[in-house]
UniProtKB/Swiss-Prot annotation:
CDD domains: Tm-1-like. HAMAP family: UPF0261 (MF_00677). Signal peptide: none annotated. PANTHER family: UPF0261 DOMAIN PROTEIN (AFU_ORTHOLOGUE AFUA_1G10120) (PTHR31862:SF1). InterPro entries: Tobamovirus_resist_UPF0261, UPF0261, UPF0261_C, UPF0261_N. Belongs to the UPF0261 family. The lineage of its organism: Bacteria, Pseudomonadati, Pseudomonadota, Gammaproteobacteria, Enterobacterales. This is UPF0261 protein YPO3839/y0391/YP_3209. Pfam families: UPF0261 (PF06792), UPF0261_C (PF23189).
């Protein structure tokens, strides 16, 4: 089946731009499908291949939910309709969106629903700030429009031309499936201070598995769990769960409250650990909340400051993680590296704190309801000790090879 590059925007304000980008892409020999997402009902011909009324019809409550007369409600409703519309399409080679704040909020939820690997480019006036809410756990590329998307001029023509040709290039040079794609994929979480562990595990398992390493920056855990939820992972070695620290204690690399939920939903084979639970991440010292002024800090670099978690915070984290693990009915092993949770959390290192470590271990043991499938396992090593990496590998192989009950 032929595939097309979908181009979406609100033609009542960006019709010129839509036509311009479509013509540029078609000039490369590729085909386009233009989509109008205007939220004001109109009798005019938008010039798009798919009119706004057609997209609005995909809303569960029908077109009237979109064409309601309230701009905010209309944008939210059209976002739902467009998401459902795009999910229904089987001929999508790429999706290019153009918009301001409203258009970006309208288009990116649909982009998030498309499979990873399908090119997604959002040209937006919002792309110079925090775009995490627009991207989520997807592989959306954001391009700052520089000027508002309000007509063609010497700047917008250059920016939109770049966008058109970037998407066309991504489609033209799409990577063919390689032999490694035949291997089952594993998700692994890593931080700089747990790198030796994850590298050792990946090296050992790479002959049998395609090892996908996710940087545990908040979005990394979300991306990994999205793949697990989509059935694209054969197992998870979630050895770096540091995102929980930031969620609970105001850090800047926080996961969401849904962390671990995909593991519970999918019953995917899971080996977890305490990687970097000794630290909360902040930006430069000037950005640290005043309530933490008297805490122990480590300057990772000019833009990253790490705060040591306390005994009480370790109790809270262990309880939170333990309650999440109790919801998991698949094969689960949570490994405790008694010699420390990171490169900084080891005897003689800046974050070594036996009381905090003991508090975490004790609370996790008290919280987790252990069964034949759900176990907490202790090892007398630091997380970066090669023997701990080997233990993680052995636990993973054991649960993968266990007969299902």
């Amino acid at each position: 089946m032929p595939r097309h590059i979908y181009i979406a925007t609100t033609t009542d304000t960006k019709g010129q731009e839509l036509a311009y980008v479509s013509e540029l892409i078609q000039a490369t020999g590729l085909t386009t499908v233009t989509v109008d997402l205007s939220t004001k009902e109109s009798q005019r011909d938008s010039g798009a291949d798919i009119c706004a009324e057609t997209v609005a019809g995909y809303h569960p409550d029908g077109r009237q939910a979109v064409f309601c007369g309230d701009r905010g409600q209309a944008i939210n409703a059209m976002a739902i309709a467009f998401e459902r519309f795009m999910v229904s399409r089987v001929d999508v080679a790429a999706l290019l969106g153009m918009g301001g704040s409203g258009g970006t909020a309208l288009i990116t939820p649909a982009m998030q629903r498309l499979p990873i690997g399908i090119p997604k480019l959002m040209v937006s006036t919002m792309a110079s700030g925090d775009v995490s809410g627009y991207i989520g756990a997807s592989d959306i590329a954001m391009m700052y429009s520089v000027t508002d998307i309000a007509g063609l001029n010497r700047i917008s023509r250059r920016v939109l031309s770049n966008a058109a040709h970037q998407v066309a290039g991504a489609v033209y040079f799409a990577q063919e499936a390689s032999p490694v794609d035949d291997k089952p994929a594993l998700g692994l979480t890593m931080f700089g201070v747990t790198t030796p562990c994850i590298q050792a595990v990946s090296a050992e398992l790479s002959d049998e598995y395609d090892c996908l390493v996710f940087h545990a920056t908040g979005s990394g855990g979300k991306a990994m769990e999205k793949l697990a939820e989509s059935g694209l992972l054969a197992g998870v070695l979630d050895l770096t769960t540091t995102e929980v620290c930031d969620l609970l204690f105001d850090g800047v690399l926080a996961c969401g409250p849904e962390r671990f939920d995909a593991i519970a939903h999918t019953h995917i084979p899971y080996v977890g650990s305490c990687g970097a639970l000794d630290m909360v991440n902040f930006g430069s010292p000037a950005t640290i909340p005043a309530k933490y002024a008297d805490r122990l800090f480590y300057k990772h670099n000019a833009q990253v400051t790490l705060m040591r978690t306390t005994e009480q915070e370790n109790i809270e984290m262990a309880r939170w993680i333990g309650e999440k693990l109790n919801r998991c009915q698949g094969e689960v092993r949570f490994l405790i590296p008694e010699g420390g949770f990171s490169a900084l959390d080891a005897p003689g290192q800046p974050f070594w704190d036996e009381k905090a470590l003991t508090a975490f271990i004790r609370t996790l043991e008290e919280t987790v309801i252990q069964t034949d499938k759900r176990r907490v396992v202790h090892y007398p090593f630091n997380i970066n000790d090669p023997l701990f990496a080997q233990a993680a590998i052995e636990n993973f192989k054991e649960i993968v090879n266990r007969p299902s009950h």
